[in-house]
Amino acid sequence: KTVNLDNYCGYAEMGEGEEIVGIAGHLDIVPVGGDWSYNPFELTRKGDYVYGRGTTDDKGPVMEALYAMKLLRDSGVKLNKRVRLIMGCNEETGSRCMQHYNEVAEELSCGFTPDASFPCIHGEKGHMGMTVYSKNTKIIAMNGGFVSNAVCDNCTAVIPAEDGLKEKLEAAFANTKLQEYKVTEENGEIHIEAKGVPAHASTPTLGVNAAGVIFECLEQVGFEDDFVKFYNSHIGTSCDGVGVGLKCQDAYGELTLCNGIVKTEDGVISCTIDIRVPVTFKEEDIRSMCEGKLEDENGRIEINSIGNPLFFPRESPLVEALYKAYVDVTGDTENEPMVIGGGTYAKTLKNIIAFGPEKLGVDYRIHGSDEYILVSEMEEAVLIYMEAIKNLLAI
């Protein structure tokens, strides 16, 4: 049985019963951007590697879940509950698809979203969105980044030329972690192009913020500018939120801050900031921590949104059922269920948590160029998901 829910999302379902075991994945992707070695919109296989946008986030995992359902059905296992694979189309930009699902469809009894890492995710940090605005700046234009939930890995800037400034900037950029940079001077202007390193907003320390590096180097070489000072003192190239009073951590992780997009409109520079908040901190905690630290004569920061975290106790039946499926297939008992900075459908749909398919410590280039997945890992994930569905049918 397949159902289209007003083009927000759809689902494929098998089995019978009142209760529903749900699997929720997404078909939308982030913009391509960057330099790809292969066509991002064509599946390219090189040995065990399969390249393309969405191979890991999240079209590949959706297919893994679909094949797990097929194998389970073909095995003859009695389905005492319905098993429903929900496919959304708006996860990357707000999960409006799952909000619509909640409005028009039945609540899930239990389930998972294959949009994170194995062995199991029993908590997701809270989310905070901010925008930084310039008040006074000599910067003529500055633009970079593609989405708010990824490190700004490409950025351009235009500033007024000053004697010796081009050479000073080139020397400063040479001592940074930029992959590439270019500084040119013409018609009284200096043009800067910087290429950093992409990374997901939940793990910004894995990336290099090209915009942040430009701001840092401008101040380093003596370019006097009010907004440059404001950005460097409040955001900078660190990822811990110390500049706005938000540096904190709990037993499950620390706060992270990511600058995703920089743009210039009508002479005002704005920077989108994506913050992931430790699971034990509430909205009132965060607001009080940054109170009085978001504005001065050089710039201002607006809080756009604060979303609460998700947390399931380690010993909950849902966590135990999914973790057991992972251990039974892989034999891995060293890695334990964990809390992550990423946000998934688990925050929108009730009674589910994130479960696979990524391996810990592996960079699948999600939200970056040459995103990939391994065929062998996909095959293993299918088996894990099949066992997981069996376990969920039993709780």
Task: Indicate residue ranges for each PLM-predicted region.
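Short, charged/polar, Gly/Pro-enriched secondary-structure boundary elements
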Residues: 16-22, 199-201
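An extended, acidic, His-containing surface patch that forms the Zn2+-binding/catalytic region
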Residues: 3, 198-266, 272, 276-288, ...
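Active-site metal-coordination/substrate-binding segment of hydrolases
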Residues: 20-87, 93, 104-109, 368-371, ...
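Beta-strand segments within the central parallel beta-sheet cores of soluble alpha/beta enzyme folds
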Residues: 80-88, 141, 229-232, 303
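A non-catalytic alpha/beta surface segment that caps or lines the substrate-entry region
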Residues: 1-19, 41-44
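Short secondary-structure junctions
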Residues: 1-4, 45, 139, 180-183, ...
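A common structural junction motif
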Residues: 28, 173-181, 221-222, 292-298, ...
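Midchain, well-structured core segments that form catalytic/ion-binding scaffolds
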Residues: 92, 98-278
